[in-house]
Amino acid sequence: PQIAMANSLGMRVIVTDHHEVPYIEENGERKEQLPPALAVVDPKRADDTYPFSGICGGVVALKLIQAITEKTGNPGLVNIQEELLEFAALSTVCDVMELKDENRILVKEGLKRIQKGYNEGLKALMEVNDIAPDRLSAYHLGFVLGPCLNATGRLDTAKRALELLQSFTRADAMTAARELKDLNESRKNLTVQGIQRADEYIQEHHMAEDKVMVIYLPEVHESIAGIIAGKVREKYHHPVFILTKGEDGVKGSGRSIEAYHMYDAMTQVKEYFTKYGGHKLAAGLSMREEDIEPLRAALNKKCTLTEDDFIPKVHIDVAMPMGYADDALAGEFALLEPFGTGNPRPLFAQKGLVFQAGFKMGANKTCARFRVKTPEGTTQTVVFFGDLEKLGAFLDEKYGVGSEEVLYAGKGNFPLSVVYQVSQNTYKGKTEVQFVMQNYC
Protein backbone atom coordinates (compact mmCIF):
# COMPACT_ATOMS: atom_id res chain seq x y z
CA PRO A 1 0.00 0.00 0.00
CA GLN A 2 2.81 2.44 0.83
CA ILE A 3 4.53 1.99 -2.54
CA ALA A 4 1.23 2.29 -4.41
CA MET A 5 0.52 5.54 -2.57
CA ALA A 6 4.01 6.84 -3.38
CA ASN A 7 3.42 6.00 -7.04
CA SER A 8 0.10 7.85 -7.01
CA LEU A 9 1.90 10.93 -5.70
CA GLY A 10 4.38 10.83 -8.56
CA MET A 11 7.24 9.47 -6.47
CA ARG A 12 9.64 6.87 -7.80
CA VAL A 13 10.53 4.06 -5.40
CA ILE A 14 13.50 1.67 -5.42
CA VAL A 15 13.20 -1.32 -3.08
CA THR A 16 16.33 -3.10 -1.84
CA ASP A 17 16.10 -6.42 -0.02
CA HIS A 18 17.91 -9.70 0.45
CA HIS A 19 15.10 -11.95 1.69
CA GLU A 20 13.34 -14.71 -0.20
CA VAL A 21 10.86 -13.19 -2.65
CA PRO A 22 7.19 -13.91 -1.80
CA TYR A 23 5.56 -16.26 -4.27
CA ILE A 24 2.41 -18.13 -5.15
CA GLU A 25 2.25 -21.57 -6.75
CA GLU A 26 0.21 -22.07 -9.89
CA ASN A 27 0.22 -25.38 -11.75
CA GLY A 28 3.32 -26.46 -9.87
CA GLU A 29 5.26 -23.30 -10.75
CA ARG A 30 6.33 -20.50 -8.45
CA LYS A 31 5.33 -16.99 -9.47
CA GLU A 32 7.11 -14.24 -7.59
CA GLN A 33 5.05 -11.42 -6.12
CA LEU A 34 7.07 -8.22 -6.50
CA PRO A 35 6.00 -4.79 -5.23
CA PRO A 36 5.03 -2.15 -7.87
CA ALA A 37 8.28 -0.22 -7.50
CA LEU A 38 10.46 1.38 -10.17
CA ALA A 39 13.07 -1.26 -9.32
CA VAL A 40 13.35 -4.16 -6.87
CA VAL A 41 16.99 -4.94 -6.12
CA ASP A 42 17.17 -8.38 -4.51
CA PRO A 43 19.76 -11.08 -5.29
CA LYS A 44 17.14 -13.71 -4.38
CA ARG A 45 14.98 -12.80 -7.39
CA ALA A 46 14.69 -15.67 -9.85
CA ASP A 47 15.76 -13.42 -12.73
CA ASP A 48 18.70 -11.88 -10.86
CA THR A 49 22.10 -12.55 -12.43
CA TYR A 50 24.37 -11.38 -9.61
CA PRO A 51 26.90 -14.21 -9.04
CA PHE A 52 26.51 -14.44 -5.24
CA SER A 53 23.07 -14.25 -3.64
CA GLY A 54 24.17 -14.71 -0.02
CA ILE A 55 24.69 -11.03 0.80
CA CYS A 56 22.81 -9.17 3.54
CA GLY A 57 20.52 -6.16 3.17
CA GLY A 58 23.26 -3.74 4.14
CA VAL A 59 25.51 -5.02 1.36
CA VAL A 60 22.65 -4.84 -1.16
CA ALA A 61 22.36 -1.15 -0.26
CA LEU A 62 26.13 -0.78 -0.71
CA LYS A 63 25.82 -2.38 -4.16
CA LEU A 64 23.18 0.20 -5.07
CA ILE A 65 25.61 2.96 -4.08
CA GLN A 66 28.30 1.33 -6.22
CA ALA A 67 25.94 1.19 -9.19
CA ILE A 68 25.01 4.86 -8.76
CA THR A 69 28.72 5.71 -8.56
CA GLU A 70 29.41 3.93 -11.84
CA LYS A 71 26.49 5.68 -13.55
CA THR A 72 27.22 9.18 -12.26
CA GLY A 73 31.00 9.09 -11.92
CA ASN A 74 30.67 11.04 -8.67
CA PRO A 75 34.14 10.90 -7.01
CA GLY A 76 32.65 11.64 -3.59
CA LEU A 77 30.72 8.38 -3.67
CA VAL A 78 33.96 6.44 -4.18
CA ASN A 79 35.25 7.59 -0.79
CA ILE A 80 31.90 6.85 0.83
CA GLN A 81 32.07 3.25 -0.36
CA GLU A 82 35.35 2.71 1.45
CA GLU A 83 34.03 4.35 4.61
CA LEU A 84 30.97 2.12 4.55
CA LEU A 85 33.03 -1.07 4.30
CA GLU A 86 33.25 -1.53 8.08
CA PHE A 87 29.47 -1.22 8.37
CA ALA A 88 29.01 -3.72 5.55
CA ALA A 89 31.19 -6.12 7.56
CA LEU A 90 29.14 -5.50 10.70
CA SER A 91 25.83 -6.05 8.95
CA THR A 92 27.09 -9.20 7.23
CA VAL A 93 28.15 -10.85 10.48
CA CYS A 94 25.22 -9.59 12.56
CA ASP A 95 22.71 -10.87 10.00
CA VAL A 96 24.45 -14.27 10.19
CA MET A 97 25.41 -14.44 6.54
CA GLU A 98 27.77 -17.20 5.44
CA LEU A 99 31.39 -15.99 5.50
CA LYS A 100 32.34 -17.30 2.10
CA ASP A 101 32.81 -15.89 -1.38
CA GLU A 102 32.36 -12.11 -1.39
CA ASN A 103 31.24 -11.97 2.26
CA ARG A 104 34.55 -13.31 3.51
CA ILE A 105 36.49 -10.54 1.77
CA LEU A 106 34.03 -7.86 2.88
CA VAL A 107 34.36 -8.91 6.51
CA LYS A 108 38.12 -9.36 6.35
CA GLU A 109 38.67 -5.88 4.91
CA GLY A 110 36.00 -4.34 7.12
CA LEU A 111 37.71 -5.73 10.22
CA LYS A 112 40.95 -4.05 9.13
CA ARG A 113 39.21 -0.67 8.94
CA ILE A 114 37.56 -1.11 12.35
CA GLN A 115 40.92 -2.09 13.87
CA LYS A 116 42.46 1.15 12.58
CA GLY A 117 39.84 3.17 14.47
CA TYR A 118 38.53 5.32 11.63
CA ASN A 119 35.11 5.52 13.30
CA GLU A 120 35.17 7.13 16.76
CA GLY A 121 31.97 5.36 17.78
CA LEU A 122 33.14 1.85 16.98
CA LYS A 123 36.51 2.60 18.57
CA ALA A 124 34.76 3.68 21.78
CA LEU A 125 32.45 0.67 21.73
CA MET A 126 35.48 -1.62 21.51
CA GLU A 127 37.11 0.22 24.41
CA VAL A 128 34.15 -0.03 26.81
CA ASN A 129 33.94 -3.76 25.99
CA ASP A 130 37.69 -4.28 26.59
CA ILE A 131 38.41 -5.39 23.02
CA ALA A 132 41.98 -4.73 21.93
CA PRO A 133 42.04 -3.67 18.24
CA ASP A 134 44.62 -6.33 17.32
CA ARG A 135 42.37 -9.04 18.83
CA LEU A 136 39.20 -7.97 17.00
CA SER A 137 37.50 -10.80 15.09
CA ALA A 138 34.19 -11.63 13.44
CA TYR A 139 33.15 -13.11 16.79
CA HIS A 140 33.31 -9.66 18.39
CA LEU A 141 31.19 -8.17 15.61
CA GLY A 142 28.46 -10.76 16.04
CA PHE A 143 28.46 -11.28 19.79
CA VAL A 144 29.76 -8.04 21.36
CA LEU A 145 29.63 -4.93 19.16
CA GLY A 146 26.56 -5.93 17.14
CA PRO A 147 24.38 -6.70 20.17
CA CYS A 148 25.31 -3.35 21.73
CA LEU A 149 24.27 -1.50 18.57
CA ASN A 150 21.08 -3.55 18.26
CA ALA A 151 20.13 -3.17 21.93
CA THR A 152 19.22 0.49 21.50
CA GLY A 153 16.82 -0.31 18.67
CA ARG A 154 15.36 -3.19 20.64
CA LEU A 155 14.72 -1.38 23.93
CA ASP A 156 14.88 2.32 23.11
CA THR A 157 15.44 4.02 19.75
CA ALA A 158 17.90 3.17 16.99
CA LYS A 159 18.85 6.84 16.85
CA ARG A 160 21.17 6.30 19.81
CA ALA A 161 23.24 3.78 17.86
CA LEU A 162 23.32 6.14 14.89
CA GLU A 163 24.47 8.97 17.14
CA LEU A 164 27.33 6.77 18.36
CA LEU A 165 28.46 5.99 14.82
CA GLN A 166 28.25 9.68 13.89
CA SER A 167 30.26 10.87 16.91
CA PHE A 168 33.15 13.17 16.02
CA THR A 169 34.78 13.48 19.45
CA ARG A 170 36.11 10.82 21.77
CA ALA A 171 34.12 12.25 24.69
CA ASP A 172 30.78 12.01 22.86
CA ALA A 173 31.63 8.55 21.55
CA MET A 174 32.59 7.20 24.98
CA THR A 175 29.41 8.55 26.57
CA ALA A 176 27.24 6.96 23.88
CA ALA A 177 29.19 3.69 23.97
CA ARG A 178 28.72 3.32 27.73
CA GLU A 179 24.99 3.93 27.35
CA LEU A 180 24.73 1.26 24.66
CA LYS A 181 26.67 -1.23 26.75
CA ASP A 182 24.33 -0.63 29.70
CA LEU A 183 21.31 -1.08 27.44
CA ASN A 184 22.75 -4.35 26.15
CA GLU A 185 23.13 -5.61 29.72
CA SER A 186 19.43 -4.86 30.26
CA ARG A 187 18.65 -6.71 27.04
CA LYS A 188 20.64 -9.72 28.26
CA ASN A 189 18.64 -9.84 31.50
CA LEU A 190 15.34 -9.63 29.63
CA THR A 191 16.52 -12.38 27.29
CA VAL A 192 17.35 -14.71 30.19
CA GLN A 193 13.90 -14.11 31.66
CA GLY A 194 12.32 -14.76 28.26
CA ILE A 195 14.18 -18.05 27.83
CA GLN A 196 13.04 -19.20 31.27
CA ARG A 197 9.46 -18.29 30.41
CA ALA A 198 9.72 -20.17 27.10
CA ASP A 199 10.87 -23.30 28.94
CA GLU A 200 7.89 -23.00 31.28
CA TYR A 201 5.54 -22.54 28.32
CA ILE A 202 6.88 -25.67 26.63
CA GLN A 203 6.17 -27.70 29.77
CA GLU A 204 2.77 -26.11 30.44
CA HIS A 205 1.55 -26.71 26.88
CA HIS A 206 3.04 -30.21 26.55
CA MET A 207 5.08 -29.28 23.49
CA ALA A 208 7.63 -32.08 23.83
CA GLU A 209 5.88 -33.95 21.02
CA ASP A 210 5.63 -30.93 18.70
CA LYS A 211 7.97 -30.99 15.74
CA VAL A 212 7.62 -27.23 15.35
CA MET A 213 7.40 -25.21 18.56
CA VAL A 214 5.05 -22.21 18.50
CA ILE A 215 5.47 -20.33 21.78
CA TYR A 216 3.34 -17.31 22.72
CA LEU A 217 4.94 -15.00 25.28
CA PRO A 218 2.81 -11.82 25.25
CA GLU A 219 4.87 -10.12 27.97
CA VAL A 220 8.18 -10.44 26.07
CA HIS A 221 9.42 -7.39 24.17
CA GLU A 222 9.00 -8.11 20.46
CA SER A 223 12.54 -6.92 19.72
CA ILE A 224 14.15 -9.83 21.58
CA ALA A 225 11.84 -12.56 20.25
CA GLY A 226 14.42 -13.62 17.67
CA ILE A 227 17.19 -13.92 20.24
CA ILE A 228 14.98 -16.06 22.49
CA ALA A 229 13.92 -18.20 19.52
CA GLY A 230 17.57 -18.84 18.69
CA LYS A 231 18.40 -19.89 22.25
CA VAL A 232 15.37 -22.20 22.48
CA ARG A 233 16.26 -23.69 19.08
CA GLU A 234 19.78 -24.40 20.34
CA LYS A 235 18.47 -26.11 23.46
CA TYR A 236 15.79 -28.30 21.88
CA HIS A 237 17.06 -28.51 18.29
CA HIS A 238 13.57 -27.96 16.90
CA PRO A 239 12.24 -25.19 14.66
CA VAL A 240 10.95 -22.48 17.01
CA PHE A 241 8.61 -19.51 16.70
CA ILE A 242 8.50 -16.99 19.56
CA LEU A 243 5.35 -14.85 19.38
CA THR A 244 4.71 -11.67 21.37
CA LYS A 245 1.95 -9.11 21.66
CA GLY A 246 2.66 -6.14 19.41
CA GLU A 247 0.94 -2.80 18.96
CA ASP A 248 -1.27 -4.25 16.25
CA GLY A 249 -1.84 -7.95 16.86
CA VAL A 250 0.84 -10.58 17.37
CA LYS A 251 4.40 -10.35 16.08
CA GLY A 252 7.04 -13.02 16.11
CA SER A 253 10.37 -14.41 14.99
CA GLY A 254 11.34 -17.91 13.98
CA ARG A 255 14.63 -19.79 14.02
CA SER A 256 15.04 -23.13 12.31
CA ILE A 257 17.28 -26.17 12.02
CA GLU A 258 19.15 -27.23 8.89
CA ALA A 259 16.56 -29.83 7.83
CA TYR A 260 13.59 -27.42 7.91
CA HIS A 261 13.12 -24.62 5.37
CA MET A 262 11.21 -22.17 7.53
CA TYR A 263 10.19 -19.71 4.83
CA ASP A 264 8.80 -22.43 2.55
CA ALA A 265 6.94 -23.99 5.50
CA MET A 266 5.38 -20.62 6.32
CA THR A 267 4.32 -20.14 2.71
CA GLN A 268 2.34 -23.39 2.95
CA VAL A 269 0.26 -21.90 5.79
CA LYS A 270 0.40 -18.22 4.80
CA GLU A 271 -3.33 -17.76 5.43
CA TYR A 272 -2.53 -17.45 9.13
CA PHE A 273 -0.19 -14.47 8.66
CA THR A 274 -0.97 -10.84 7.99
CA LYS A 275 2.70 -10.38 7.04
CA TYR A 276 5.71 -12.70 6.88
CA GLY A 277 9.14 -13.02 5.35
CA GLY A 278 12.56 -14.51 5.84
CA HIS A 279 14.97 -17.26 4.86
CA LYS A 280 15.51 -20.98 5.28
CA LEU A 281 16.74 -20.65 8.87
CA ALA A 282 15.07 -17.46 10.11
CA ALA A 283 11.83 -15.56 9.62
CA GLY A 284 9.60 -12.80 10.95
CA LEU A 285 5.82 -12.55 11.02
CA SER A 286 2.67 -10.71 12.06
CA MET A 287 -0.65 -12.45 12.75
CA ARG A 288 -3.91 -12.43 14.70
CA GLU A 289 -3.88 -13.77 18.26
CA GLU A 290 -6.82 -16.11 17.62
CA ASP A 291 -4.81 -17.88 14.89
CA ILE A 292 -1.92 -18.96 17.13
CA GLU A 293 -3.21 -22.44 17.99
CA PRO A 294 -4.47 -23.12 14.43
CA LEU A 295 -1.01 -22.11 13.17
CA ARG A 296 0.68 -24.46 15.61
CA ALA A 297 -1.58 -27.32 14.46
CA ALA A 298 -1.10 -26.57 10.76
CA LEU A 299 2.69 -26.30 10.92
CA ASN A 300 2.99 -29.57 12.80
CA LYS A 301 0.53 -31.36 10.52
CA LYS A 302 2.51 -30.42 7.42
CA CYS A 303 5.95 -30.95 8.98
CA THR A 304 7.85 -33.94 7.57
CA LEU A 305 10.83 -33.88 9.96
CA THR A 306 11.88 -37.21 11.48
CA GLU A 307 13.30 -37.97 14.93
CA ASP A 308 16.75 -38.20 13.36
CA ASP A 309 16.46 -34.55 12.26
CA PHE A 310 16.14 -33.47 15.90
CA ILE A 311 19.43 -35.06 16.95
CA PRO A 312 22.26 -32.47 16.87
CA LYS A 313 25.15 -33.71 14.76
CA VAL A 314 28.77 -32.69 15.16
CA HIS A 315 30.88 -32.98 12.01
CA ILE A 316 34.62 -32.91 12.68
CA ASP A 317 37.25 -32.17 10.06
CA VAL A 318 39.66 -34.86 11.23
CA ALA A 319 40.60 -36.87 14.32
CA MET A 320 43.91 -35.38 15.48
CA PRO A 321 46.04 -35.79 18.63
CA MET A 322 46.49 -32.49 20.44
CA GLY A 323 50.24 -32.96 20.28
CA TYR A 324 50.13 -32.37 16.52
CA ALA A 325 49.05 -28.76 16.99
CA ASP A 326 52.01 -26.42 17.35
CA ASP A 327 52.50 -22.68 16.89
CA ALA A 328 53.11 -23.05 13.16
CA LEU A 329 49.87 -24.99 12.59
CA ALA A 330 47.85 -22.58 14.72
CA GLY A 331 49.32 -19.71 12.71
CA GLU A 332 48.24 -21.35 9.46
CA PHE A 333 44.69 -21.69 10.77
CA ALA A 334 44.69 -17.94 11.39
CA LEU A 335 45.08 -17.44 7.63
CA LEU A 336 41.61 -18.98 7.17
CA GLU A 337 39.94 -16.22 9.19
CA PRO A 338 37.48 -14.61 9.52
CA PHE A 339 35.65 -17.61 10.93
CA GLY A 340 31.90 -17.73 11.36
CA THR A 341 28.76 -19.09 9.72
CA GLY A 342 29.69 -20.81 6.46
CA ASN A 343 33.41 -20.73 7.30
CA PRO A 344 33.67 -22.39 10.71
CA ARG A 345 36.91 -22.81 12.60
CA PRO A 346 38.25 -26.36 11.94
CA LEU A 347 37.03 -29.01 14.37
CA PHE A 348 39.24 -31.85 15.63
CA ALA A 349 38.65 -34.74 17.97
CA GLN A 350 40.65 -37.02 20.24
CA LYS A 351 39.58 -39.98 22.37
CA GLY A 352 40.90 -40.99 25.75
CA LEU A 353 41.78 -37.60 27.21
CA VAL A 354 41.96 -38.03 30.99
CA PHE A 355 40.63 -34.99 32.85
CA GLN A 356 42.76 -34.58 35.97
CA ALA A 357 42.04 -31.08 37.30
CA GLY A 358 39.83 -28.08 36.68
CA PHE A 359 39.80 -24.38 37.53
CA LYS A 360 36.82 -22.07 37.00
CA MET A 361 37.58 -18.69 35.42
CA GLY A 362 35.86 -15.41 34.67
CA ALA A 363 34.12 -12.86 36.85
CA ASN A 364 31.11 -15.13 37.25
CA LYS A 365 33.06 -18.42 37.07
CA THR A 366 31.21 -19.38 33.90
CA CYS A 367 34.18 -20.86 32.02
CA ALA A 368 36.95 -23.24 33.02
CA ARG A 369 40.45 -24.47 32.33
CA PHE A 370 41.22 -28.20 32.60
CA ARG A 371 44.43 -30.18 32.84
CA VAL A 372 44.21 -33.33 30.72
CA LYS A 373 46.56 -36.22 30.05
CA THR A 374 46.67 -37.46 26.46
CA PRO A 375 46.98 -41.12 25.37
CA GLU A 376 50.51 -40.21 24.26
CA GLY A 377 51.39 -39.35 27.87
CA THR A 378 51.67 -35.58 27.48
CA THR A 379 49.80 -33.02 29.56
CA GLN A 380 47.70 -30.35 27.85
CA THR A 381 45.46 -27.50 28.97
CA VAL A 382 41.92 -27.34 27.60
CA VAL A 383 39.59 -24.36 28.04
CA PHE A 384 35.80 -24.59 27.96
CA PHE A 385 33.37 -21.71 27.49
CA GLY A 386 30.23 -23.84 27.38
CA ASP A 387 27.68 -24.86 30.00
CA LEU A 388 29.68 -25.87 33.10
CA GLU A 389 26.57 -26.98 34.96
CA LYS A 390 25.71 -29.38 32.16
CA LEU A 391 29.30 -30.68 32.06
CA GLY A 392 29.25 -31.27 35.81
CA ALA A 393 25.97 -33.18 35.59
CA PHE A 394 27.44 -35.30 32.78
CA LEU A 395 30.50 -36.20 34.88
CA ASP A 396 28.36 -37.06 37.90
CA GLU A 397 26.16 -39.31 35.78
CA LYS A 398 29.05 -41.00 33.97
CA TYR A 399 31.50 -41.42 36.85
CA GLY A 400 29.34 -41.10 39.96
CA VAL A 401 27.94 -38.33 42.13
CA GLY A 402 30.67 -36.01 43.34
CA SER A 403 32.91 -36.45 40.29
CA GLU A 404 32.66 -32.76 39.43
CA GLU A 405 33.93 -31.78 42.89
CA VAL A 406 36.77 -34.28 42.61
CA LEU A 407 37.83 -32.78 39.27
CA TYR A 408 37.92 -29.21 40.58
CA ALA A 409 39.85 -30.44 43.62
CA GLY A 410 42.59 -31.59 41.24
CA LYS A 411 42.08 -35.31 41.86
CA GLY A 412 40.26 -36.31 38.68
CA ASN A 413 40.79 -39.43 36.61
CA PHE A 414 37.99 -39.16 34.06
CA PRO A 415 38.60 -40.26 30.43
CA LEU A 416 36.53 -38.36 27.85
CA SER A 417 36.39 -38.05 24.08
CA VAL A 418 36.65 -34.40 23.12
CA VAL A 419 35.86 -32.30 20.05
CA TYR A 420 38.08 -29.22 20.08
CA GLN A 421 39.31 -26.21 18.16
CA VAL A 422 42.85 -24.90 17.90
CA SER A 423 43.49 -21.20 18.36
CA GLN A 424 46.17 -18.85 19.63
CA ASN A 425 45.95 -16.99 22.93
CA THR A 426 48.10 -13.97 23.75
CA TYR A 427 48.62 -13.04 27.39
CA LYS A 428 51.14 -10.51 28.69
CA GLY A 429 52.88 -10.46 25.33
CA LYS A 430 53.23 -14.23 25.07
CA THR A 431 51.33 -16.14 22.38
CA GLU A 432 50.67 -19.86 22.74
CA VAL A 433 48.47 -22.58 21.29
CA GLN A 434 45.06 -22.88 22.94
CA PHE A 435 42.72 -25.88 22.82
CA VAL A 436 39.04 -24.94 23.13
CA MET A 437 36.67 -27.81 23.94
CA GLN A 438 33.42 -27.70 21.96
CA ASN A 439 31.82 -31.08 22.69
CA TYR A 440 32.49 -34.11 24.85
CA CYS A 441 31.25 -37.61 25.50
PLM features: what roles do these ranges have?
Residues M5, L9-G10, V15, Y23-I24, ...:
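Acidic, glycine-enriched active-site microenvironments
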Residues I14-H18, V41-D42, I215-Y216, I242-L243, ...:
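General beta-strand structural signal in soluble alpha/beta enzymes
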Residues E20-V21, P36-T49, V60-T69:
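A short, charged helix-loop
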Residues P51-V59, E222-I227:
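Short, conserved micro-motifs enriched in small and acidic residues
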